[in-house]
UniProtKB/Swiss-Prot annotation:
UniProt source species: Artemia franciscana (Brine shrimp)
Annotated binding of ATP, by residue: 122-126, 185, 229, 280-284, 309-314
EC number: 2.7.3.3
Keyword Disulfide bond: no
Name used for this protein in its record: Arginine kinase
Phosphagen kinase N-terminal domain location: 9-91
Domain Phosphagen kinase C-terminal: 119-356
Length: 356
């Protein structure tokens, strides 16, 4: 049973959301009194409650979504709240839909988006994975963080070929290593206020680490927002090379570490926006003519299911007219389709820029 103190906090949180008239988050939209009363006394087998799910959105009324899953079971137990939010965010993925089986497709059908290097500064494809048998950040113990870091570092240190590299634990990291990783834009910081409020940063920096290959085109974050963030990137617009490297890496890691997968939702992640393929394929791109009117840029982008962000990602501005543009859809389509959607959309934006 959920204790009285938690119930009190839940009621206060619910009232706060109700009273926040300018709050536009999905948690406010879908956490009705009926849903709230249905879920407030439930607890997962690892002890997570509705409070763990909604507290980031309660604390940060400017959240876009406002909920996180403290463990895999939360997606099922708190489905009356997660399902409509998933459907709203992953446009039209209803509670009766199932995410298709994983399919990375034929990488050879992709190419270089910008062979003349006029527009695309860099290309990046990432995915998130959770380790089977472990909860997500808020429910992890210090011992589990350490255990996961050991598993992940030994797996990654066994990679060879172009993926061969070094694992750097955040604990006890030398200042010069830290500075180098910051200069490379590889180092992740302790979570932002959204993650902090979701209790995603406990025991920091225990269990956190960064791996990168010698060429600095392949990167893995261990226990940042998700258990694993697997990232492939390089300068220029050669999406085929970037994607092929990611696919190779995911397959190699999965041989050694089983990932957490849900029959209906695909690969499970801490934040419901990343479910399904978990794939985010993005470019840093300069489109000076289109970007002169950001509203128009966003209109065109949304036609191709693309998301426009500032240069440094979410909640940032575009520096020097450089935008971060990525696929928006991650659920209800295959990995290949998600990447192809970005490929086709960016190709179209470049065409429009050239004719503007």
């Amino acid at each position: 049973m959920v204790d009285a103190g938690t119930l009190e906090k839940l009621e206060a949180g619910f009232q706060k959301l109700q009273a926040a008239t300018d709050c536009k988050s999905l948690v406010k939209k879908y956490l009705t009194r009926e849903v709230f009363d249905q879920l407030k006394t439930l607890k997962t087998s690892l002890g997570a409650t509705l409070l763990d799910v909604i507290q980031s959105g309660v604390e940060n009324l400017d959240s876009g979504v406002g909920i996180y899953a403290p463990d895999a079971e939360s997606y099922t137990l708190f489905a009356p709240l997660f399902d409509p939010i998933i459907e709203d965010y992953h446009i039209g993925f209803t509670k009766n839909d199932s995410h298709p089986p994983s399919d990375f497709g034929d990488v050879n059908t992709l190419g270089d988006l910008d062979p003349d290097n006029k527009f695309v500064i860099s290309t990046r494809v990432r995915c998130g994975r959770s380790l089977q048998g472990y909860p997500f950040n808020p429910c992890l113990t210090e011992a589990q963080y350490k255990e996961m870091e050991d598993k992940v570092s030994s797996t990654l240190n066994g990679l060879d070929g172009e993926l061969k590299g070094t694992f750097y634990p955040l604990t006890g990291m030398a200042k010069e290593v830290q500075q180098q990783l910051i200069d490379d834009h590889f180092l992740f910081k302790e979570g932002d206020r959204f993650l902090q409020a979701a209790n995603a940063c406990r025991y920091w920096p225990t269990g956190r680490g960064i791996y990168h290959n010698d060429a600095k085109t392949f990167l893995v974050w261990c226990n940042e927002e998700d258990h694993l963030r697997i990232i492939s990137m390089q300068k220029g617009g050669d999406l085929k090379a970037v994607y092929a490297r990611l696919v190779n890496a995911v397959n190699e890691i999965e041989k050694r570490i089983p990932f957490s997968h849900h029959d209906r939702l695909g690969y499970l992640t801490f934040c419901p926006t990343n479910l399904g393929t978990t794939i985010r394929a993005s470019v840093h791109i300069q489109l000076p003519k289109l970007a002169a009117d950001r509203k128009r840029l966003e209109e065109v982008a949304s036609k191709y299911n693309l998301q426009v962000r500032g240069t440094r990602g979410e909640h940032t501005e575009a520096e020097g007219g450089i935008y971060d543009i990525s696929n928006k859809r991650r659920m209800g389509l295959t990995e290949y389709q998600a990447v192809k959607e970005m490929y086709d959309g960016i190709a179209e934006l470049i065409k429009l820029e050239q004719s503007a």
